[in-house]
Regions:
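FIC/Doc superfamily catalytic core
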Residues: 1-95
Length: 95
């Protein structure tokens, strides 16, 4: 399973802000790291979020809830979730 790196998230965030406006800046690096790692938590041999959709949802939730950026946290959460699903082979159909 492919993960989004911190660098990729920062680039996606910059792209979103350039397209939709907002204040740039990372508010808390630790909260960003936490949001990126949370979907891949495990306890013993058991994944906390075993399926791709669960991991994607947890990534979105972490970025929104942790609020690591100055602005655009909900936007990056939703966008990162969709990019994560796409790079892991999920075909997204918008109707």
């Amino acid at each position: 399973m492919r993960r989004l790196s911190k660098r990729q998230i920062l680039l996606l965030h910059d792209q979103l802000l350039s397209q939709s406006g907002g204040s740039p800046g990372l508010r808390d690096d630790g909260l960003l790291e936490s949001a990126l790692n949370a979907p891949f938590q495990s306890f013993g041999d058991t994944d906390a979020y075993p399926s791709l959709p669960q991991k994607a949802a947890r990534l979105c939730y972490g970025l929104v809830k942790n609020h690591p950026f100055v602005d655009g946290n909900k936007r990056i959460g939703a966008h990162a979730m969709l990019v994560f699903l796409t790079i892991n082979g999920t075909e997204l159909v918008y109707t």
